Amino acid sequence: MKLIVWLGNPGKEYEKTRHNIWFMVVDDFLERWKMEACKEGKNWCNILETMIDNQKIIFLKPMEFMNRSWWAVSTIVNFYKIDPKDILVIHDDIDLIVGKIQLKLWWSSAGHNWLKNIIEKLWTKDFWRLRIGVDRPNHQDQVAEYVLHPFKKEEKNIIDDKINEIENHIKDFLSK
């Protein structure tokens, strides 16, 4: 069994923001892969259970703000008894240029409080992360505002050009 978690913030006002890049991308994949949309859960997550190549896959879309997403991840991991190495957490990263993609196992929180919380609740760093760069603002004090703003058109085009590469990374994780 594999768990794929994609993080963002709930609500219409955040739909097209940098923090929600994965809400946009993975929702698109589910449509491209002809999967039904995630079912609405108990207010704190949307979930889709499916089979791919005879393997159960759970897609989890926490419907809490980023800093509270650990609750949904921890609850689902404990309920299904999922091995951390079978978890892929997908998120944006300001330390990577727009469109740069990295898939890695065992990473630090890199200063992300929500990721630090997930590591604490799982008692391990030993899970997969797929990061996509959204770039960094010019000044550190602008980060919170920056990630809650939409991409510029040229940045969105860069992301759109990476869709197949992102899909291949997800398929690579599923084959591990």
Name every feature range the model reports, one short phrase each:
Residues 2-105, 116, 120, 126-130, ...:
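Nucleotide and nucleotide-moiety/phosphate-recognizing core
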Residues 102-108, 147-151:
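Short glycine-enriched, charge-decorated loop/helix-capping segments at active-site entrances
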Residues 112:
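Active-site PLP attachment segment
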Residues 140-160:
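Short, electropositive alpha-helical surface patch
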